[in-house]
Amino acid sequence: MNDLYNGDRAVRKNAAVEMTAGLTDNNHILTHIFNTLAADKMITDRLRKHPSWINAMNLHNELQNKTVDTLIEAVTSRYDIVHRYYLVKRRLLGLDKLEHFDRYAPLPSLPTKEIDWRSCRETVLRSFAEFSPRMAEIAEMFFARNWIHAPIGEGKRGGAFAHPCVPEVHPYVLVNYTGSLRDVSTVAHELGHGVHQFLAAAQGHFNSDTPLPLAETASVFAELLVFNSQLALLTSDEERRAFICQKLESIFATVFRQTAMNRFEQLMHEGRRSHGELSSAKLSEYWLTTQRAMFGDTVQLGDDYGIWWSYIPHFLSTPGYVYSYAFGELLVLALYGLYRQEGEPFVAKYLELLAAGGSRSPYELLQPFGIDLDSPAFWQKGLTVIEEMLTRVE
């Protein structure tokens, strides 16, 4: 998958071809697995009297069906943002058309300077401190007390995460730091989780865990703080444009892509319940239909891309989960917009939100901000922030 981010188009194309071949070789068993687990969920939902395939996840997330429907409708109504962005990317890459393996191609002017660990630490803590000295103070403890492990080492697992442990102790953070701008963002993201977990620990074992839709609030907000600090340091228009584009693609991955995946899941589960076992061709049809709705005609999605539904683990392990990413990202973008409007009064309310953990429902936790999760206008606030970023690079 890493080769899909390679600057060499031939490498990206070869990676896509190999990915398709690998999935195709396992097509029969993957189709069987998807059908079996979809049928298992259908039976469980029937026994538990859930009125729809998504109801169980909504109940787990402490959200009303209306709220989730409003979110999905808001995002799909703004797929035009995706269409406009990839027209920009095609122009910046100098291509006549974008194939699906060009989606993650790096822009030539993206800053490549390596950032050492000390500079990363200073950037993150400065960004946090400009927002809230308390937030920076907590994050500083992760560095000073060795609550964060960053070096790459033999036998160390990949990726990044924050683990809350138990309320009586403190969280730990793991990252694999290589010095890229993206890695600095990852450190900010995981420290956002760490700060959230540290503050929420006072709620104890039963209430410190945050409801899933709000679990990414602190992490994505922390990313935004650092992104704006990094952007301010770039002096070249080309570098600034490329850096904003990279951020837009990250947002697209959590807002629009996850929503399109939700649309695929709906077709799959409803199709399984209405028509019985689904063929691989039918699942690929569902996938291409929902992906093409998102990309429009700005990215060419050939039939070879049709099998790519079969590598998404969330469809199997946590049905209905993916909309939570879009929920969290748009919520943070809207909260950041409120911060820009309110300034200092916002900060105290925000830290109280983090410290509340899971002691109240999402609706109750967001009440101090005057947020109505059932209002289409609320979700449009976050989408408007995305559009404003897009306008800066068009």
Label every model-predicted segment.
Residues Q64-T67, D116, G153, R157, ...:
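Secondary-structure capping and boundary motifs in well-ordered enzyme cores
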Residues R126, E130-E137, H163, H193, ...:
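Conserved helix-loop functional segments at active or binding sites
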Residues L107-L110, C120, A201-G271:
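Acidic/histidine-rich catalytic neighborhood
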Residues E62, R91-F101, V187, V195, ...:
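C-terminal, non-catalytic "cap/extension" segments appended to globular domains
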Residues L4-M19, A56-D69, D102-T112, E168-L181, ...:
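Glycine- and acidic
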Residues K49, T178-A200, S219, L224, ...:
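Active-site recognition of the HExxH zinc-binding catalytic motif
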Residues R9-Y172:
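Contiguous, non-catalytic segments that form substrate-binding/exosite surfaces or channel walls
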